[in-house]
Amino acid sequence: ALAKIHHSNKIRVVMLDEGVIGEYRVRDLKPLAARFGEQIIDAKGISTLPEETRKTLISSNVKIRENGISLLLNPATAYYSSRLAGEREKTVESAIQLKEKLGRPISVADPYCGVGPAVVQLLAQQGLVGDLLATDINPEAIIMLKRNLGEIKESWHCKATDALKLNQNPKLLGRFDLLLMNLPHSTLQHLSQLLPLLKTNAPTLLRGWYIVEEEEIPSAEAEFTNIIRQTQTLNSNFKLEIRRQFNTTKVLTRFECRFGDW
């Protein structure tokens, strides 16, 4: 760690990543070395600093670039994965097509928004988004989201919320043109609770991701189809597209459903 930080003046702190912890799936980071004024101190030196100084010194707030936009994130307090960056780029492409079909800015619901990588990229497109729901069960993620969004319209719904309780708010039902389902381990279990957020009288779009045993894809597709048909009419057969291997037996899949006349 000391060698790494000596090697580059741009490195402020070196952390040991001990993996994902807790229900919010944040990173367990331990400081190994940090730049303190003109000195470089190790973990023992860091531990002797006053608490406020130590907190500032080893803060894991970091700004990154993804698909041309800046994002503030903190992996120790809110989940973020760069692995879906390409998928978020494709979400923008599909959203633009929906806007062109409707001839107006679209209303977007992202119930598992995290620090906002998907919605920030949608908002970066001039005139693409009108109404917005961006929620997450992790309050720390919403704090970071609001910093990433900057100006937030009064009509937008941006707060720490359990996604499964959104359908209890009548003002949110049938309000959105685009629904993002980015909770890959639980998408199948949650979808029926979130579909009522979509409009039913105009073209709409559902995009989501799901982690599944590869051999169980056909049965999962049948389950998704049954859930969707309870509130929407499918324009084509539901299909889970494999995006990448998740582990030795499971894969990350993507689905996109277009409802209505388009």
Regions found by a protein language model. Give the residues of each.
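SAM-dependent transferase fold signal centered on methyltransferase-like domains
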Residues: A1-W262
